[in-house]
Amino acid sequence: MSSDGRRRARDFSAGGVVVDGDQVVVIVPVKRAADGRSVLGLPKGHPDGDETPEEAARREVAEEAGVTGELIDELGEVRYNYERRGRTVAKRVRFYLFRYVSGNVADHDHEIEDARWMPIEQASRDLTYAGEREMVRRAMSRSPPDR
């Protein structure tokens, strides 16, 4: 419940942190932040139908970043609130760590302005949202060595 007694809406998404050595895939969605600025973030989105969160994260990585990855580990959840049509929405995003397997970041979908590789240390500082920066830091500590 919110402070005014109304039931709070809930929203869930799943996302991926895709690493290749010391690089991580980041995206710039076409959709801007509430203040109009562009966002530097991680691929994520809602599960389709009966998809598991892991399946949704894998699909979103492929669609939004143009790459595929091998699932390594669950990194955790980011939780935050946002406003939609005058209601507070409690959002949860579960992130997974993937090791890059194939694909090209130039093959991202139309919802994404840009997808690119970035040094993981830089991403841990430069991503727009603190929760996503934390997921990258967790990935840094859990990333397996290169094959």
What are these regions (language model features)?
Residues 41, 90, 117:
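Short aromatic/basic micro-patch
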Residues 2-42:
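N-terminal strand-loop-strand
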